[in-house]
Amino acid sequence: MKTLLLTLVVVTIVCLDLGYTMTCYNQQSSEAKTTTTCSGGVSSCYKKTWSDGRGTIIERGCGCPSVKKGIERICCRTDKCNN
């Protein structure tokens, strides 16, 4: 019985990949590339793009936020996928 419980715990840890943290780009527009380590179990990165009087604005970060009409949003689920 103990062996079965230990096996289940090991399988759970392997399947859940406990301790994994997502890394996303977080630079804005044309700034130099920077990254951030996401917290709180966040498992996606985003890139939002929109235009205003100054030109095209790009925002990057962790998560997958909702956006207003006229803002293009791309969400992805691998490290540094939001370039």
Curated annotation (Swiss-Prot):
InterPro entries: Snake_3FTx, Snake_toxin-like_sf, Snake_toxin_con_site, Toxin_cobra-type. Its main location: secreted. Keywords: Acetylcholine receptor inhibiting toxin, Disulfide bond, Ion channel impairing toxin, Neurotoxin, Postsynaptic neurotoxin, Secreted, Signal, Toxin. This is Short neurotoxin 1. It is found in: Secreted. GO terms for molecular function: acetylcholine receptor inhibitor activity; ion channel regulator activity; toxin activity. SUPFAM superfamilies: Snake toxin-like. It holds the Pfam family Toxin_cobra-type. Disulfide bonds join 24-45, 38-62, 64-75, 76-81. CDD domains: TFP_snake_toxin. Belongs to the three-finger toxin family. Short-chain subfamily. Type I alpha-neurotoxin sub-subfamily. Gene3D superfamilies: CD59 (2.10.60.10). Residues 1-21 form the signal peptide. The keyword Disulfide bond applies.
